[in-house]
Amino acid sequence: QPSITGDLVSENDLVLLVMPQDIQAPKGRLILPQVQTMRELLDKKCLITSCTTDKLPQTLKALAYPPKLIITDSQVFKTVYEQKPAESLLTSFSVLMAGYKGDIRQFVEGASAIDRLTENSCVLIAEACAHAPMTEDIGRVKIPRLLRKKVGEALHIDMVSGSDFPKDLSKYDLIIH
C-alpha cells in the first residue's frame, strides 16, 4: 500500500512538522499535503508536534529529545536545515508528495537534465495547480529565476497551467511539472 512517509518513521517516532503560514490556505486551514501527512503519521501511531518557522528554535528546545524526522515546506527548507539537530532527518511535504504520487526515481533522473541545459535549451514549466499565481510564485518566478541564473538569461521557458498542456513535447529539453 502506498505511503506518504514510507519507512522514514515507525510507531512512537517523534515527527516535527514545520509549517509556515501558507498564503494559499485560508485562515484557519492547512493545505492538503499537510493534512494527509498528519493523518498518516497518526495512523502509524507517531508522536507529532508542529510549529511555524519562527517558532522552530523554541519548539526544538521544548522537546525532550530530537525528532526522528522533520517535515517542512520547500520555501523554508534551508532555514530549517540550518537549525535542525544533526541526528534528525529532514524532508519536505513536496518531496514526500512527489514520492507518494509519482515515480521519485524518475524525478531524480529528470532533475539531472538541469546540468545539461544550455542557453539554447527550451524548458516547459507545467503547473497542475488551479490557484491564481502569487507575486513570488515558485513556478512562474522562482524556478525560472534559478534556472536562468544557472544556465543563462537566454534560456527559453514556456509556462502552462491547468489543462493547457502542449501536445508536442519534442522541443523541450526539460519539463517541470
Residue locations for each model-derived region?
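C-terminal-of-GTPase-core extension/linker across diverse P-loop GTPases
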Residues: 1-139, 145-148, 153, 159-174
